[in-house]
Amino acid sequence: GIVAIARLVKVYELSATLKGVDTEEAVSDSDTKFNAKLMMPFLLAFFAFCIYLVYSYKDNLLPESASEHGVEIDRLFNFNLIIIGIVFIAVNILLFYFAFKYYSRKGVKATYFAHSTKLEMIWTIVPALFLAVIIIYGLAVWNKITSPIDPNQAVVMELCAEQFKWTARYGGNDNVLGESNYKLTADLNPLAIDTTDKNSWDDKIVTGEFHLPVNKIVLMYFRSKDVIHSAYMPHFRAQMNCVPGMKTEFHFKPTITTAEMREKTKNPEFDYVLMCNKICGATHWSMQM
């Protein structure tokens, strides 16, 4: 229907052109001036709406980070948000102000120039400098988070993903995980653990819920039995892909207990959650622990 209407309008314009009829509607100075005056009130209304959205949805944001490295992640996020916010505000103010000040009027023509080296340098170098600061800061934070640790100083565990559940495995009394190999997968050995490896004999396997120690480094290994999953623990600001046929790892130090977070959020039913952050199938949404 819309395409047909557009075609009819085009036919009308072509026929009018052939007849020598001017189809352009005359716009008076008073019309353009009126529209220009509306720009500033619209700008204020737009900013007011943005402030309203921030205020309305602030309670849906994540609470403070419950991990040591998460504080750095939040600081980096806020740093980016401040830069983006300044650019967002400045660009919109200039956009609406120029539409208000330089509206079309009779006898006034805009200056056209094809090239300006100075302008090209400004809008290339300035964003590049800001981007360089963000990248360098981000890399510094990432290198700090992923720096090597001594496994002997951490609680070692593994998260195994499959459609559509998680299984956790702890290193047991020796804090060492037994080896695993996908070729060993069987009904009686769903995690494909190498039972000939003595380190696996005291491994603790849990489903439904797992626990992390507070103020102690946790070294997590991740793997998948089927498709790519992504272990996402939003309150700890931690995420790592689970890839079939290989192990990935991530370490962090929890700093806030469940009881403390319940008090901070004033939510007696609060619990930390592990979710899959990759669309892995029909009931991906239910893959939580």
Language-model segment annotations:
Residues 1-83:
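Hydrophobic alpha-helical segments
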Residues 2-10, 87-104:
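Transmembrane alpha-helical segments in integral membrane proteins
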Residues 43, 84, 88-91, 127:
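Alpha-helical transmembrane segments of integral membrane proteins
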Residues 52-79, 92-289:
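Non-transmembrane, membrane-proximal soluble domains of secreted or membrane proteins
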